[in-house]
Each structure stands twice: as structure tokens, then as C-alpha cells.
């Protein structure tokens, strides 16, 4: 923040980024661009272009922007380089306080869900998750609790708990807190439990949050994500090559547990 305004600066060597390319990306990430101020720095043998965007968030932001700043910057770079899709799922980087790889995981489940023949568009699914950031975040926590091989290591669990505790003020709105005052504490306490108890606690919390969803269509979509995760047998999400995550996410499903899956002919 600067002078009470929220700003996003892009530094690039050689040439400025094309504004018409950047705007849709920023909008899909939950920022409305109000103004742009371009600058150029002439250095010996080097031109550095600075684009200073004044932006207005379309999703709630926490008071401490340090972690959001880093996470958003990484996501925008990956998006700009064409390594992730430019769609409304990227809004969850800010709305649900998740990183770009966690967004890719949710996007992957959506792609599979659409293949099962659900009567919703991807854009509608994107809007549904963005409208319910607490549920989106708990779906991510459910995925980690099910599949993260380090989840039961105390140091790793403590780190996950601290992250959730830091983000919960943004992700869980006042309306949810007033209706479910014990939910946050219950979820945070679950991180020190064995894996099967973590799963039970997260699923219970998801069930309570889903009871607050008024739209039948949105309820069906969000429950479908939960059921797809329960039907997942394994994933490559945590596998690394040369110390880095793979550039794709894959899942293996037990098709008998996938809800409303058409029977083979």
C-alpha cells in the first residue's frame, strides 16, 4: 500500500508488458485496475521498465499484505509466462489465501467434474468457489490432510496450522464467524491430531459451512468437490523433480465413488 492506495508494480527489462494483456490477468486475479503509471530507467546497456498499477481489490484482503504480496507476485509471474491458465480460479490466490499450485489442484478437479456431465460451466464453478472462500480453503486443507505425506510430522503440521491461523481472518468472514463461532478454533486444534482425526474435523467443518450455502446449485458444486476428493486414490501433487514440483497435477479416482458418474455403455 502507498498513500492509502493499493499498488502493484511490475519491473521488466527490455520492454514494458502490454497493458491489454495484463489487465485481464489482473482482473481474473481479483484486482480492478484504476490507473497505470509507466516509468523507464535508462542504465548503461540496460532498459528497465516499471509499471505502477493502482488497483482496487474485488475480494477481501487482510491487514497484513506481506504474505499476499509474495504469493500474488509468484502467481502473476507464472500466469504471465503461460505456466498457468488465465481464468477465474486465480481469484482464489487472494480470496482463499492459497498459492498458485493449490489453485491448479482445484482447477484440475473442476476439469474432471465438467467431464462427468454436470450442468454447469467452468465460469460458474469459478464464481461459486470465489463466493465461498472459506469452503474453497477448507477443500485445500482436506486435500492436504488426505495426501500430504508429511502431514503427520509435528513440525510440518505446526507450519500448516500457523499458516491457517494467519489467513483465517481474511478467509472466514464475519458472517460465518457469527453463525459458527466455534468453527475456527475446532479446525485449528485439529492440526495436532492424527491424520484420520484431521480429516474428520475438516469434513465436519465443511459440512457446517455447506449448511450456510443458500443456492442449491452452488451447494451441489461444492459438495461435488468434497466427494471427488474422497474418491481420489492418489495424486502426483507432492512429487518433485530436481527439487521442484511437477508442472502438472494428476489424480487417480475410484470411479465407483464419483457421484453421478455416467455408467459405461
Describe each region flagged by the PLM.
Residues 1-31, 35-265:
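Non-catalytic interaction/regulatory segments
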Amino acid at each position: 500500500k502507498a498513500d492509502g492506495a493499493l499498488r502493484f508494480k511490475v519491473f521488466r527489462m527490455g520492454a514494458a508488458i502490454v497493458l491489454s494483456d495484463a489487465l485481464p490477468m489482473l482482473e481474473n486475479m481479483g484486482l480492478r485496475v484504476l490507473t497505470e503509471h509507466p516509468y523507464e530507467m535508462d542504465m548503461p546497456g540496460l532498459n528497465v521498465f516499471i509499471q505502477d498499477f493502482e488497483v482496487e481489490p474485488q475480494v477481501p484482503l487482510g491487514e497484513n499484505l506481506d504474505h499476499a504480496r509474495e504469493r500474488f507476485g509468484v502467481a502473476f509471474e507464472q500466469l504471465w509466462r503461460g505456466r498457468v491458465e488465465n481464468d477465474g480460479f486465480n481469484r482464489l490466490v487472494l480470496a482463499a489465501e492459497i498459492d498458485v499450485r493449490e489453485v491448479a489442484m482445484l482447477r484440475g478437479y473442476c476439469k474432471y467434474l465438467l467431464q462427468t456431465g454436470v450442468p454447469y460451466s467452468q465460469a460458474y464453478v469459478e464464481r461459486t468457489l470465489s463466493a465461498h472462500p472459506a469452503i474453497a480453503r477448507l477443500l485445500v486443507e482436506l486435500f492436504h490432510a488426505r495426501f500430504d505425506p508429511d502431514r503427520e510430522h509435528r513440525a510440518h503440521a505446526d507450519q500448516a496450522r500457523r499458516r491457517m491461523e494467519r489467513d483465517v481472518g481474511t478467509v472466514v468472514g464475519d458472517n460465518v464467524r457469527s453463525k459458527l463461532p466455534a468453527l475456527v478454533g475446532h479446525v485449528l486444534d485439529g492440526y495436532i491430531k492424527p491424520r484420520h482425526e484431521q480429516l474428520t474435523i475438516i469434513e465436519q467443518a465443511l459440512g457446517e459451512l455447506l449448511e450456510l450455502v443458500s443456492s442449491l446449485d452452488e451447494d451441489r458444486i461444492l459438495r461435488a468437490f468434497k466427494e471427488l476428493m474422497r474418491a481420489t486414490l492418489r495424486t502426483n501433487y507432492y512429487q518433485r523433480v530436481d527439487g521442484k514440483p511437477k508442472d502438472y497435477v494428476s489424480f487417480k479416482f475410484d470411479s465407483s465413488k464419483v457421484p453421478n458418474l455416467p455408467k459405461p455403455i
